[in-house]
């Protein structure tokens, strides 16, 4: 009864929506704007472009990254997403201070207030620590977003060439939820080549350094969109801690839908999500017709947890797998793609064995293993965001990224500046977002972006105190080891001299009091070395 009440109340909510995020601002989808290549909408607060009169931002030329990219995509100038968003727009709003948005009408993450000067930190909770009312509200919010047309954004239904270079706009309305399904599809879709074929080894959101910053930004935008659709500024994305899970704990009618009694691929009719229609789930069809997903409904949400290829994914990640992954010190290595060894990013993404860090294309682990395990809409990269479990899964992946950032304290220079796969260099604008943000801007700790995770916030104070000392220890451990070896040699020499001059005294019985002290010292050194 409580769940029904929440759903009805939320469904009848009077919406007052403001600037949003996504792909193409509705205000920039006309032929006039596309031909001018200037996407600098007016901020209603002062009726000036980008809120310039109020000092919120200015309309500026887009300056794409000129750093060389990797060899994975050996083409240039054939895909609309290259040097984003130059193909569509070469001028956009550049917001100042703590302002943000396609027209600088909002606050940056972590700030609020009329002038975006009030600092704010939100906590994302483990879904299994949420109250019944909170869970019901989450489901109601998702349903509302699924059935509410985004007032500020539209999706492209054709390439720039198919739009006749802007003179024939091809855009469509989309719901607030499906907007983010489409964004995930568009960033990961294959590229159309000039000879009529497609190039599959391209992805602006996966299989490269940008995987974690891109999804961090994506989740923040998704979270804020839900806040706007519902009018609930306190909403945060929950997460699913899947460490050591033996089954899909969220695949029940209480959460995101149990299994249909007569079909293993469908959801239980008792679940609200059984009526959901999915989009962008037919990449082979789009490629053969050389079309872009247009947001048309393509059938029910599919999920069949545990009925997957167990040779590829024998089990879900364990706590030991997670800890082994977090212990990797290098964010990115080698070719910076799915072949990277000892790369934290590649291991967390699931292309490398967590216990060794060695890439293995025959196995799907960590993040990838959940997509394979759920065995349905989640198992297709381009359409995986159709399943609402996607958001909770990626929120936990983001929390592991956060753990790594806090543990290793990397500088921005750790994120590769050049030679990463196309779209993944540090200064590359993330595809397909407007307003523009680079990969490097989200290679920062979550608290700098105004949010935290409940299980990290609870242990954060002790961790924050110890981290500087642990980092210093990591930096000097080799020096300490060398000093210990040198000290041992000196001690041996001195011992030899004493031995030659004091043979008789060496025969004296060692007192019982000294033995435990020496043993304790040896044990301490062994523990210290193993900890390092």
From Swiss-Prot:
Entry-linked Pfam families: Tyrosinase
Position of the signal peptide: 1-19
Coiled-coil parts of chain: none
A molecular function (GO) term: copper ion binding
Residue positions the entry lists as glycosylated: 90, 115, 165, 234, 341, 375
Ligand binding (Cu cation A): 184, 206, 215
Segments on the Cytoplasmic face: 500-532
Record-level GO BP terms: melanin biosynthetic process from tyrosine; pigmentation
Membrane topology type: Single-pass type I membrane protein
Transmembrane segments: 476-499
Catalysed reactions, as listed in the record: 2 L-dopa + O2 = 2 L-dopaquinone + 2 H2O; L-tyrosine + O2 = L-dopaquinone + H2O
UniProt keywords, alphabetically: Copper, Glycoprotein, Melanin biosynthesis, Membrane, Metal-binding, Monooxygenase, Oxidoreductase, Signal, Transmembrane, Transmembrane helix
PANTHER family reported for this sequence: LOC100125152 PROTEIN, TYROSINASE FAMILY MEMBER
The protein's name in its UniProt record: Tyrosinase
Organism: Pelophylax nigromaculatus (Black-spotted frog)
């Amino acid at each position: 009864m409580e769940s029904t009440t929440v759903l009805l109340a939320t469904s009848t909510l009077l919406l007052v929506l403001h600037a949003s995020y996504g792909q193409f601002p509705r205000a920039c989808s006309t032929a006039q704007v596309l031909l001018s290549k200037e996407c600098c909408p007016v901020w209603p607060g002062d009726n000036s472009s980008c809120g310039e009169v109020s000092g919120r931002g200015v309309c500026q030329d887009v300056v794409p990254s000129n750093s060389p990219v990797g060899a994975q995509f050996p083409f240039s100038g054939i895909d609309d997403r290259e040097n984003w968003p130059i193909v569509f727009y070469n001028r956009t709003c550049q917001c100042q201070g703590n302002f943000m948005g396609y027209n600088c009408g909002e606050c940056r993450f972590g700030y609020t207030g009329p002038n975006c000067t009030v600092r704010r930190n939100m906590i994302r909770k483990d879904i299994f620590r949420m109250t019944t009312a909170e869970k019901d509200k989450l489901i109601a919010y998702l349903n509302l977003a699924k059935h509410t047309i985004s007032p500020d954004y539209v999706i492209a239904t054709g390439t720039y060439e198919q739009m006749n270079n802007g003179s024939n706009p091809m855009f469509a309305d989309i719901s607030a939820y499906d907007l983010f399904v489409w964004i995930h599809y568009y960033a990961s879709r294959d590229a159309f080549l000039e000879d009529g074929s497609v190039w599959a080894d391209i992805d602006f959101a996966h299989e490269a350094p940008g995987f974690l910053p891109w999804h961090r930004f994506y989740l923040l935008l998704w979270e804020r969109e839900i806040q706007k659709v519902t009018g609930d500024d306190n909403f945060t994305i929950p997460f699913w801690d899947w460490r050591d899970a033996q089954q899909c704990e969220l695949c029940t009618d209480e959460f995101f839908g149990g299994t249909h009694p007569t079909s293993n691929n469908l959801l239980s009719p008792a679940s609200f999500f059984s009526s959901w229609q999915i989009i962008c789930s037919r990449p082979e069809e789009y490629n053969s017709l050389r079309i872009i997903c247009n947001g048309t409904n393509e059938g029910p949400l599919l999920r069949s947890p545990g009925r997957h290829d167990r040779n590829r994914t024998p089990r879900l990640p364990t706590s030991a797998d997670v800890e082994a992954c977090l212990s990797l010190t290098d964010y990115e290595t080698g070719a910076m793609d799915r072949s990277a060894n000892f790369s934290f990013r590649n291991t967390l993404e699931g292309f490398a064995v967590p216990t060794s860090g060695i890439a293995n294309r025959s196995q799907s682990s960590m993040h990838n293993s959940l997509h394979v395990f759920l065995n349905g809409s989640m198992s297709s990269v381009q359409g995986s965001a159709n399943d609402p479990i996607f958001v909770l899964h990626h929120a936990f992946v983001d929390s592991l990224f956060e753990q790594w950032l806090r543990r290793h304290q990397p500088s921005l220079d750790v994120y590769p500046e050049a030679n990463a796969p196309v779209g993944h260099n540090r200064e590359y604008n993330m595809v397909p977002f407007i307003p523009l943000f680079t990969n490097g801007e989200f290679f920062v700790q979550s608290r700098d972006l105004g949010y935290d995770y409940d299980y990290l916030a609870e242990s954060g104070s002790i961790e924050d105190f110890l981290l500087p000392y642990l980092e210093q220890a990591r930096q000097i451990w080799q020096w300490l080891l060398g000093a210990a070896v040198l000290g041992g040699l000196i001690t041996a020499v001195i011992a030899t001299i004493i031995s030659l001059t004091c043979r008789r005294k060496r025969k004296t019985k060692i007192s019982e009091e000294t033995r435990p002290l020496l043993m304790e010292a040896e044990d301490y050194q062994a523990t210290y070395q193993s900890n390092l």
